[in-house]
Amino acid sequence: MDEKDVILSNGLKVHYYEWPGSKPALIFLHPSSGYGRMWEATANHLGSRFHIYAIDQRGHGSSGRPDGDYSAEEYADDLRLFLTAVGVDKAILAGQSLGGRVGIVFAAVHPERTMGLALVGGPHLSNFFPTREAVLGVLAASQRMLESETEFASKDAALAYLRKLRPRDREEALRHRVEHNLAQAGTGWAVKYDKVRVALGLAHMADDLKKYALRTTCPVAILRGNHSSELTLEEAKRVAGFWKNASVIDVEGDYALQMENPPGLAEALIRWTV
């Protein structure tokens, strides 16, 4: 694994991780409050089957935190500029939550550069059925992010907080978050994301993305956790109908499959792309 920085033509510094391998390129896009290296275990299980990139998206990790609307459209334009900067013409995209929204927009707007789109954990229903109730849920999630703890006296304190916040994650995955998504701040530790920017991005979970799905021509895989708390099988099949060529593939787990079940996610990606 190589760790690098690149300055995009819009001035954004993007920090990213690269696992050299065979073509095609596979781009991993993390969720809100996530970080590029959270795909590390999945990338290692994939081996050299793909040339893999995992990005710290704007507002996250060691990438820049400029002003902006932090919409999927803005992130998708960052992705376009990133691919150009690193010399990738076409790629398979795999994203979870925020990363999935970015992929949905990118695949529709840049079909000539998208070989396939994998939605890890599945898309948010609120992006396809933005009912009043769904919007209330989105705004509540955004508010919870604003109120979340972001500074800790020690790594042990951060780990204890994450255990309560993410009870489904493996202990190894929680420790990975502590090791790679915190930075020293004074005498303690702080998360490596801007929670105000993240909260703004979360508010876009009420944006209607159906128009993008309807324009997409590449194959789409909804990689749903088989005991998902976010998306039932029936809901996944219903949302899949908005794409011309989408399939639903169940993977052992709940939602953050790259943290809960990296080998299972890697196997599903391999089967889908064969």
Where are these regions (language model features)?
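Conserved hydrolase catalytic core segment
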Residues: 89-132
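Catalytic histidine-centered segment of alpha/beta-hydrolase-like enzymes
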Residues: 253-266
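Conserved alpha/beta-hydrolase catalytic His-Asp/Glu region
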Residues: 149-207
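Conserved acidic catalytic loop of the alpha/beta-hydrolase fold
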Residues: 74-91
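A catalytic-pocket lid/entrance helix-loop region that shapes and gates access to the active site
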Residues: 123, 127-151
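Catalytic histidine neighborhood in serine/cysteine hydrolases
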Residues: 242-255
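Conserved serine/cysteine hydrolase catalytic core
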Residues: 184-241
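Conserved HGGG/HGGXW glycine-rich cap/lid loop of the alpha/beta-hydrolase fold
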Residues: 12-65
